[in-house]
Amino acid sequence: MPSKIALSISVLTAALGMVSAAPHYEYKSYNAGHNVESVVENKLVDASDLTLGVDILKRTDYSACKKYVSSYNAGYNVYSINENKLIDLSDATVKLSLLTNNGRPVKTWNKAPRYCLEYIKSYNGGHNVIIDNENKLIDLSGLNLGIDILKRKAPEFSYYNPGHNVKSTTENKLVDASDLLANVNILSKRGDKYSYYNGGYNVESDTENKLIDLSGLLANIDILKKRTGSQYSYYNGGHNVESTNENKLVDASDLLANVDILKKRGDKYTYYNGGHNIESTNENKLIDLSDLTANVGVLDDVHVNIGLLDKRTDKYSYYDGGHNIELTNENKLIDLSDLLANVDVLKKRTDKFSYYNGGHNVESDTQNKLIDVSHLTAIVNALSKRTDKYSYYNGGHNVESTNENKLIDLSDLTALVNVLSKRSLKGYGSKIHARDISEELYRRTNADEDCTCVKKSKPTPPKQTVTKPSADCDAPPAVTPKPKPSTKPSPSPTTPPPSKDTSKPTTKPEPKPQPSDKPEPKPSDKPEPKPSDKPEPKPSDKPEPTPSPKPTPPKVTCGTDEVYVDEGHNVVSKNSNKLLDLSNISINIGILDGLFGGKKSKEVAADSTCTSKQGCCVSKSVYYYNGGNNVQSSNENSGIDLSGLNLGLDIL
């Protein structure tokens, strides 16, 4: 038996050796003298190297194939071969030609014989399209779609690797579009849509754990553009270009999107940090757009002699005043705290996009993002004319913005709207002064007299003396500097409450001896036998019934058009548990500013607080701020909170 088993194994080994010794050549690739390697692993459906050839001593007469190449048409013929389809549209022919200038209509051959494929390919001039589908439910594997409208003499796509190896490795992708290149051109002529040059150094992009990988996606859209070069050119500067993408669901970290409409010769966006560090930290974001920069302008560089639409100003200037700018945003569902939007349409004398790394390595590391658009740069311009739309300057100090646990965080949003403005906006700040508001924040009951209640820093309240508004103000805490003559000014009803305030420091030692009558009955009687007996019976009788109902008498009595605010509380209404938090937004309103003498703009910061010890009377037009209209609105648990919204409007 062992001899028979050994004999069978030797026979099988000899048979396998004969099969392996047979020469066979499965795949041959030639790429102008350079190697192109594509490695695709762990795909849901992997058909990258599928090659099927069946030939059993068949001889084919190719004389019948000559009719398919009788009209050569410079390599623009289309051949369609369809067999055994579930839905057969092989005889359907759709031809769409709009103002083609090549002088040759595209000819379509339907149901060409399959054995003519090699014969047709030898005459295709490099441009014929062959559609070959067999036994597919729906087969779009070789689909090539080209749409051109009014296009002339420009190659649609050219790829050249200038003598270097191009290696693309994609692993464990559900959908791999890392090398996807999409170009759409309408009326494009002789121009470079996109040029990429790494300055003689390596460009490395590492993106990991993405849902969808679009790291190499390049999308260019041009409408009515002139005098530009080839649509797409790729050159790696004489060095290797390596793109490694792993475990991405959607990776758009290197996505570059450029949209230009009638634009010429100019830089759209310049960014400079003033020689200091700019730090942006965003963590646990579902969508991170913290570095998104968008530019909007209308009618830019168009010279109009009408005195509307400002001229000769920068659209957007950002300077950190020589100090660090730190932005910390945590646990945001959507973080748009640093969003800058500028749109520009019909702009001239600008360059679309130039990327150069200054002779250094460019490294992009993005990890654990569901959708990573951190390097997305979108530039849109619409008819803009040299106006300062938005200027931000921190006055030489640190600017720190901390936003936590917001669904949508717009707490630091500042909105300025300029319509037909002739004069530049004045400084826009968040400081508040009591006399800068249309209706004073701190007001008495009578409309004839106003007084400001000042809280002094010294701990001796009896030094505050106010004689004029004594009949109106219940707030002044003291009239005389000494506690002894405090009982003298009894004719006015307002003087006893300050005496209560002066007696409060005396009452504080009083409750102490009462619970502790044993250790200190004598020392309290010795130093103050007389003054303790005189003020004690009156304040002892009064404050005992009054401390619970009378924290209110020292408060300021407010009018019908005013709202009482306690010390340390906000002057503008606060709202909590909001879906949208706009409580810290500033409002700036100016109408007909600069004309007919002008009108002062009001600046009220939403985080302004009352500093008076007796509280403040705030006008309802300020507390419930709604564009100058008095609206009483208290919002809690609201879906959208606009109570603290500060909106800047400037008309004429």
Swiss-Prot record:
Annotated glycan sites: N584
GO molecular function, one term: structural constituent of cell wall
GO biological processes: cell wall organization; hyphal growth
Record's compositionally biased regions (Pro residues): 478-499, 545-554
Signal sequence coordinates: 1-21
Subunit structure: The rep1-1 peptide assembles to form functional amyloid fibrils resulting in amphipathic layers at the surface of the cells. Interacts at the cell wall with secreted protein lep1.
Protein name, entry field: Repellent protein 1
Name of the encoding gene: rep1
